[in-house]
Curated annotation (Swiss-Prot):
Function: Essential cell division protein.
Keyword line: Cell cycle, Cell division, Cell inner membrane, Cell membrane, Membrane, Transmembrane, Transmembrane helix
Stated name of the protein: Cell division protein FtsQ
UniProt GO BP: cell septum assembly; FtsZ-dependent cytokinesis
Periplasmic side: 68-308
Top-level lineage group: Bacteria
HAMAP family according to UniProt: FtsQ_subfam
Family of the protein in this entry: Belongs to the FtsQ/DivIB family. FtsQ subfamily.
Species assigned in the record: Cereibacter sphaeroides (strain ATCC 17023 / DSM 158 / JCM 6121 / CCUG 31486 / LMG 2827 / NBRC 12203 / NCIMB 8253 / ATH 2.4.1.)
Length: 308
């Protein structure tokens, strides 16, 4: 039978505390080193550091250089001299001016308007401004300006063709087919091939006047001109003091009817002062006084007491 008594008390040996190793560094990173490593792993930070830092350095150097007014002036002078020497090279110099599509008189006006002192660098010629100055001339409808190789400044113009003469007060003005001014005319005899228009607002209805003249071609040699009446309609003035009064609407058709009537009845060869076509299909004739008396006598009407 085993004994129930406890064994004799023995002291439990104590464990000695671990010795600290001296001279060895803790491999774990410090807090700031850890944060720096995490920041460096950020792509945006790496890009900003690799690109932004050199840019900031360059800007800082440039700012230090340009901080001096003398340095700025010296660099500006050097740059200007470099640009001038480049622009004045022979291959960029314009020595000739060519004007195509213009009459000799208009060509002289274009040269005087441009007033270029050649030779001149092509960089000193404003082509847009030169074109605007040329197109400001009344006789020029359109212009093209360009620099060609060989030092040639080429100007191509489309000249306005005079289509009619506008009598304004005591002056004669040449107009093109749209009513644009071309030039002044000293004497009517200088352009006997062109018809004359007159009256208030005549210059604004040139296309219609030209259509009327085209329809009146069979009697064109007798036409002295067209007069604008009330800025609404036209009167055709013929020789022998005759006048054809046209309607406001469809004046060309009225002229065509008049030509057909004249070819059938020789109407304009008679003693007629005016033909009023303002009422469609009802032309009204105004006879000369002596012709009217002859008609009355033929009808047996006494004209002895009449002044007509």
């Amino acid at each position: 039978m085993q004994s129930l008594s406890f064994p004799p008390n023995r002291r439990t040996p104590r464990l000695a505390p671990p010795r600290r190793e001296t001279g060895r560094r803790d491999p774990a990173p410090s807090r700031w080193a850890y944060r720096a490593q995490r920041l460096w792993l950020t792509p945006m930070f790496r890009t900003a550091l690799r690109v932004g830092l050199p840019i900031v350095g360059v800007l800082l150097v440039v700012a230090l250089i340009f901080a001096s007014a003398d340095r700025r002036a010296a660099m500006a002078g050097a740059f200007t001299g470099l640009v001038d020497s480049f622009q004045q090279r022979p291959e960029f110099m314009v020595t000739l001016l060519s004007v195509d599509g213009a009459s000799p008189e208009l060509s002289d006006r274009i040269r005087a308007t441009l007033a270029l002192k050649l030779p001149l660098s092509s960089f000193d010629i404003d082509l847009t401004a030169a074109r605007a100055r040329i197109e400001s001339i009344d006789a020029v409808a359109q212009a093209e300006v360009r620099v060609r190789s060989g030092g040639l400044l080429e100007v191509r113009v489309t000249e306005r063709e005079p289509a009619i003469i506008w009598r304004r007060a005591a002056n004669l003005v040449l107009l093109d087919g749209t009513g644009r001014r071309v030039d002044d005319l000293a004497f009517r005899s200088e352009r006997g091939d062109l018809a004359v228009i007159a009256g208030e607002g005549a210059e604004r209805a040139v296309p219609e006047a030209l259509e009327i003249l085209a329809a009146a071609r069979p009697i064109l040699e007798r036409i002295r001109g067209l007069v604008r009446m009330g800025e609404r309609r036209w009167d055709i003035v013929l020789d022998r003091g005759q006048r054809i009064q046209l309607p406001v609407e469809e004046p060309v058709a009225a002229v065509e009817r008049m030509i057909a009537l004249d070819e059938a009845e020789d109407l304009l060869d008679r003693d007629v002062i005016s033909v009023d076509l303002r009422i469609k299909d009802r032309p009204v004739l105004r006879l000369a006084p002596y012709a009217l008396n002859a008609v009355r006598r033929a009808r047996g009407i006494d004209t002895s007491g009449s002044d007509l």
